Amino acid sequence: MASNMANPANHLPYFFGNITREEAEEYLMQGGMSDGLYLLRQSRNYLGGFALSLAYGRKVHHYTIERELSGTYAIAGGKSHASPAELINYHSEEADGLICLLRKSFNRPPGVEPKTGPFEDLKENLIREYVKQTWNLQGHALEQAIISQKPQLEKLIATTAHEKMPWFHGRISREESEHRILIGSRNNGKFLIRERDSNGSYALCLLNDGKVLHYRIDRDKTGKLSIPDGKRFDTLWQLVEHYSYKPDGLLRVLSIPCPRHGSESDNVVFDTRPLPGTPSKLQTPIGAPSDDQTPFNPYVLQRARGLIGAEKGDQREALPMDTEVYESPYADPDEIKPKNVTLDRKLLTLEEGELGSGNFGTVKKGFYKMKKGAKPVAVKILKNESNDPAIKDELLREANVMQQLDNPYIVRMIGICEAEAWMLVMEMAELGPLNKFLQKNRHVTEKNITELVHQVSMGMKYLEENNFVHRDLAARNVLLVTQHYAKISDFGLSKALSADENYYKAQSHGKWPVKWYAPECMNFYKFSSKSDVWSFGVLMWEAFSYGQKPYKGMKGGEVAQMIERGERMECPEACPVEVYDLMKLCWTYNVDDRPGFVAVELRLRNYYYDISH
């Protein structure tokens, strides 16, 4: 489940996955075709949708189950249901538009898993290649991007995948499309798809007995694609997959993609396997003459230089990778990190007004001039009229921790500057602290909040893996770059542990944020990644209560007594039970029984993928 978004039907014994209509009919015939015998399969027309195949009167009836914008499932014109299983249960008691009640499920044979579609098989590689090319990311940054943005990337890939296919030729004229198809082999079933206009319509050009046939592909008001009077599809690749199995209104099946100019020698980028499961007799294209039996995989891609994928300027929601702070400015080989990360004051300009203030001094917005231009920065300026060396040491300690950290979900230090005051120059996160943002923006969805806290868990997992304890993890110290991009900040209390240490012991009780602290911190002054996990539980509570203060109206001592009694904060009103269960797990009293961030991040990731599906 960690690598693939969970299919909400995979656990159902009567779900067969990405099988064709004909395969479904064959299975139900094997099952005896009794009235009310049914199975569930993946829709080959609609993203995230399903199809119900139901036997009645010795015939098989097929019903499309669409996934609605709200995330619910419904048969056209029917009631909405939270899941495919709930829909099936409902129709086993109410026909409500079906030809009969669902009486008996036809289950997969033992050991047979639901069949994944060919696009599913290639999706991981498509995503990896897309991220590499769109944002020029590699290594750790690439992996972090794929994990945190998987749902958005899957949607993006699903709707733009046709642009990377050899059969898609972009905006060319009718005459040019005929010219291209007639170059080289003239086998029946050779085809290409071209863009017709800016309204989202296309044309399918198909070779039949030496003649090029043109079929218009229109997009309706809901965004669905179809040839006139044909089946409707969410994407072009689903349409091509369908017509490569059967003609269904075309003169013949699509069998040989016409390659784009200059692509014949470098046609394959990821995989040359035939479509998974193609040999099945159930998948032989109906009405396809013998000369068209060449195995054709509509998912084999063009080489990288042929990619026309969505660029950053396209009309889509900005992802963290689109921002200037996803990678360190020093990741650019032209930007040389100054020695001891000491910055030249002349290259730093400060703006009027404050972003925030605290015991240490103030934070201002500024710009730091680098080789590739001025970068917006946040500058922590030390207030030290009394010239107290302890305050300076504290700032330098924070700088020392920060300069060792490099992760997309942690505020990076650009450098330090000694001038009219000591200054810590950091990445800018324009939207400010998470708690304040959520207090002012109650419209932010549960999915959006889950996305943000998952990013925080990724940043904390990185700290845990690198033996750093944050010691001040709270919603006020999570800064937002955008509504969909969070970074952990404020490392003033953070400690680096040596390789053989797993906790830090403070010498005395300081000005500590006790409402965020685990029992072992208060009782024994012991701090570890596991105590950060406790704080993360409180941070999640703050996020899902839209920035409310934890333990409102209670003093630190009262909070400690409440925890010793085994009591915990109540579930916030808008918080899903799965998230609250994870909070309670983070608030496990015994530190040895409490999960680490590896487990917490994975659990949040899986939940986020589930609700994004």
Swiss-Prot record:
Residues 349-613 form the Protein kinase domain. Residues 107-166 are annotated as: Interdomain A. The active site is at D472 (proton acceptor). Autoinhibited. Intramolecular binding of the interdomains A and B (also called linker region) to parts of the catalytic domain keep the catalytic center in an inactive conformation. The phosphorylation of the interdomains or the binding of the SH2 domains with dually phosphorylated ITAM domains on transmembrane proteins disrupt those intramolecular interactions allowing the kinase domain to adopt an active conformation. Residues 14-106, 167-258 form the SH2 domain. GO terms for molecular function: ATP binding; non-membrane spanning protein tyrosine kinase activity; protein tyrosine kinase activity. The keyword Kinase applies. It comes from the Eukaryota. It catalyses: L-tyrosyl-[protein] + ATP = O-phospho-L-tyrosyl-[protein] + ADP + H(+). Residues 259-348 are annotated as: Interdomain B. GO terms for cellular component: cytosol; early phagosome; plasma membrane. SUPFAM superfamilies: Protein kinase-like (PK-like), SH2 domain. One of its GO terms (biological process) is leukocyte activation involved in immune response. Keywords: ATP-binding, Cell membrane, Cytoplasm, Immunity, Innate immunity, Kinase, Membrane, Nucleotide-binding, Repeat, SH2 domain, Transferase, Tyrosine-protein kinase. It is found in: Cell membrane; Cytoplasm, Cytosol. Its EC number is 2.7.10.2. ATP binds at L355, G356, S357, G358, N359, F360, G361, T362, V363, K380. InterPro entries: Kinase-like_dom_sf (IPR011009), Kinase_SYK/ZAP-70_inter-SH2_sf (IPR023420), Non-receptor_tyrosine_kinases (IPR050198), Prot_kinase_dom (IPR000719), Protein_kinase_ATP_BS (IPR017441), Ser-Thr/Tyr_kinase_cat_dom (IPR001245), SH2 (IPR000980), SH2_dom_sf (IPR036860). Belongs to the protein kinase superfamily. Tyr protein kinase family. SYK/ZAP-70 subfamily. Non-receptor tyrosine kinase which mediates signal transduction downstream of a variety of transmembrane receptors including classical immunoreceptors like the B-cell receptor (BCR). Regulates several biological processes including innate and adaptive immunity, cell adhesion, osteoclast maturation, platelet activation and vascular development. Assembles into signaling complexes with activated receptors at the plasma membrane via interaction between its SH2 domains and the receptor tyrosine-phosphorylated ITAM domains. The SH2 domains mediate the interaction of SYK with the phosphorylated ITAM domains of transmembrane proteins. This is Tyrosine-protein kinase SYK. It comes from Gallus gallus. The lineage of its organism: Eukaryota, Metazoa, Chordata, Craniata, Vertebrata.
